[in-house]
A protein has these predicted regions:
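Short beta-alpha junctions and helix-cap segments that line functional grooves
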Residues: 104-108
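Hydrophobic or amphipathic alpha-helical targeting/insertion segments
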Residues: 109-114
Length: 114
């Protein structure tokens, strides 16, 4: 019997491409949702080009975030550490890449050692 005359009841389901109806999330949106899952409601930060999409996603997904604008990344990491110690909540500092990231090292090391 030729394959083109097979009854339709024996026909296989069309192959799935793995797509679903779920919306496709951007990396910044996934990051903000992860912050939510960790209970983060306050972010200390110094905006920059590399993290501007995260700031946009924070405003779009969770506009109730309390953002504390810091003037220097090192001060922001110390502020996040102090916030965590004083409240028992997650202390979060958001910095841009390059010098912004390296400026956080002292504060991160201090938090790690405590």
């Amino acid at each position: 019997m030729p394959t083109d005359t097979m009854p339709s009841s024996d026909a296989a389901a069309p192959p799935s491409n793995g797509a679903s109806d779920a919306p496709i999330l951007k990396g910044s949106e996934i990051f903000v949702r992860a912050l939510e899952e960790e209970g983060v409601d306050r972010v200390f930060g110094h905006p920059g080009g590399a993290v501007i999409k995260i700031y946009d996603a924070m405003e779009r997904i969770q506009p109730s975030y309390d953002h504390v604008l810091v003037r220097h990344e090192q001060g922001g990491t110390h502020a996040a550490e102090g916030y965590a110690k004083a409240t028992g909540r997650v202390g979060t500092m958001l910095a841009t890449s390059g010098p912004g990231a390296t400026n956080t090292v002292t504060g991160i090391a201090d938090a790690y050692l405590d």
